[in-house]
C-alpha cells in the first residue's frame, strides 16, 4: 500500500471556461476497412474487431458510429523551443539571482552549460498530422532524435554541468528548476546515446571500453546521485524533473529502482517532494511500471484518482499511463474509455500522446482482436494523426500472438506486412530488430522439425528478397539462430548465401561462423582452426590492433563450450537465458510459405508473384526460446560481441587456406577441441590487449568451464608450432 501525503498546494489548471470544446466536425476514415475501429465522441470509445477462428470469444463488439475521433480545434504554439527551455518549471523556483551572490559565476556557467545544451539537444517537434509530412514517411525518413552532433561539446557540457552541480549543491541557488533541467539534460543524453547505437553508425566491441558504454554508465551514475540527493533533502525537483528522472530509469531498464525512488519520495518527510512525485506528469510514467512490479490494479486505480484530484483538467500524461496499466491488467474497457477521452481532449500539439497510446494498444493489449485492429489502422494510415510504427511495439505484438495462440501463420503475416511498411530505406537497426524477434519464433516453431523448417526458411528468404535488398544482418541473425538444428549443411548453405546475394561479410559474420562450429559434432579441429584464421585475417583487414574479446568468445564457444556440453556438464553461460512463449489465428492473405527446391531459386527475379497461404497446420511450438529479443540483451549486443566496426563494409580479400584444405570428417577425441583452444590461445597470446585479457582466457575461463581446468596445467608445455599465424599488418604483438 502507498501512504499519500496531503497535498499542500493543488496545482493550478485551466478554468472550465478556458477548456476548448471538441471540434464539431467529423470526417469518415479515408481507408475504411472491413472491420472498422469506431470512435463515438458522445460515449466510451467503441471497437468492432474480427473474431478469429481459434481466438477467444469476442466480447468487444459494441454499438457506435463510423465517425472519426473528435479532437479539439487545432492550434499551434509559436513559442520557440528555446523560450520553453528557459521557462522550464517557472512555477516552482526563482531563477533570478543577484550579481552580488558569491556563487554568481558558477550559476551563470551552470545556466549556460545546461540551458544552452538542453536547447541544442531537444527532439525537434514532429508533424503529427496525417496529411502533413507523408512524403517524409514515404522516403523512409522518420522523426529525428536528439542530435548530439549538432553540438560537438554536448558530452563535455554534461560533464561540466555535473561538476558545477557538485559545487552548488549546498547553495540556495541550486533550486528545483536548475536541478530539473540538469536531469532533463541527462535524460536527453541517454536518448542520444541510444539513438546512435540504434542507427548502427558506431558499434564498438565489448573490450574497447567504448565511449557509448562509458557514457551510459556515467549518465546512470549521475542520475542515481541526483536521486539520492533528492531523497535526502539536499536538492529538490519540479514535476518535469521528476518525470524525466523516473523515465530515465525506465529507459535504463532499472524498473525496480524507479519504483523504489518513487515510493521513497512519496512516503518521505518532505511534503513538497511527496506532492511533486504525485503530480500527474510523474504518476503517468510510474503507473504501468508499478503494475508490472506487483502493485494490484485497484491500487493503481486509487493512485490514478489521487493524482487526478490534484488538478482540475484531464492530463494526457496521466491518462496514457493509466491506459498502459489497464492494458497490462487486461482492463481493456477502461483503456478504451480513457483513449476516447484523450481523443476528445487532444489538440494537434498533443497528438504525440495519442500516437503513444495507439502504439500501446498494438504492443501491450492482450486482446489480440483489439491489438490487430489498432495495428491495421496504423498500417492503413486511417487515423488523423501520423503514426511512426515503432518496432518495439510490433515485436511485442508478435510475442503476444505467439504466447497466446502458437499460430506461426499469423506471426508471418504481421512480420511480412511490417517489413513492407518499413520499406527499403529504413535503417538497419529497425529491420534487424524486427527480424531478430521473428526468427526467434521461427526457430522455436521448427526447432525439432528441420525437414519442414529448412524449405520454409528458404522460402522466407526469397520473399524477403522480393521485398527489399537483403543486408548482412539478415543472414547474421539466421546464421546465429539456425544452430538449433545442429546441421553443418544448413550452416554452409547460409554461409554461401552471402556470396549468392553479393553481400560482403563483416567481422560479425566471421565471428558467428566460428561460434556456430560449437553446434556441430562432426567438425574437425582443422576446420575450426581455418575459421579462426579467417576471423583473424578479417580483424587485421579492418584495422584492429589486438584480438577482441568477441573473437576469443567465438573460439571458446566452438571449442570449450562444445566440450563441456558433450561431457554433460551444464555451463553457466549468460547467453542461455530462455523465456516461455506460446501464439493468433487469422486468414489475412500473405505471400506463399510453400517450400522452394534449391539455392538457385533464391537468386530468381524479385517480381515473382506471391501466393496465398494454403499450407498445412503448424506443429505445436516448443516451450523454450532464446531471449535474444530482450532490450537489455540488445543494448549489450549493440556495444559488444557481434557488431562490426565502422569501416567493416569493404570487400573481403581472398584468403589463403593455412590448413591446406579441410580434413574429411573423422571422429576425434572429445578433448581435442579443448587442446586446440589452449594451443590457439598460447600461439596468439602476443596479440592480446594486455595480460589481464590473457588471464581471463585461461584461468578466468576455467572458473566457468570446469573441463578446461583439467587440461590447463598443460598450457605452458604445449607445442604450438602447428598453429600458423598469417601475415598481419595491423594486429601487433603488444602483449608480453
Swiss-Prot record:
GO biological process, one term: aerobic respiration
Region (Disordered): 1-28, 124-148, 566-618
Top-level taxonomic group: Eukaryota
Amino acid composition bias (Low complexity), ranges on this chain: 125-140, 579-596
Keywords annotated in UniProt: Membrane, Mitochondrion, Mitochondrion inner membrane, Phosphoprotein, Transit peptide
Sequence ranges of Polar residues compositional bias: 566-578, 602-613
Self-association and partners: Monomer.
UniProt modification remark: Phosphorylated. Phosphorylation promotes binding to RNA.
Protein name as it appears in the record: RNA-binding protein RMD9-like, mitochondrial
Function: May be involved in the processing or stability of mitochondrial mRNAs.
Family: Belongs to the RMD9 family.
Transit peptide feature, positions: 1-79
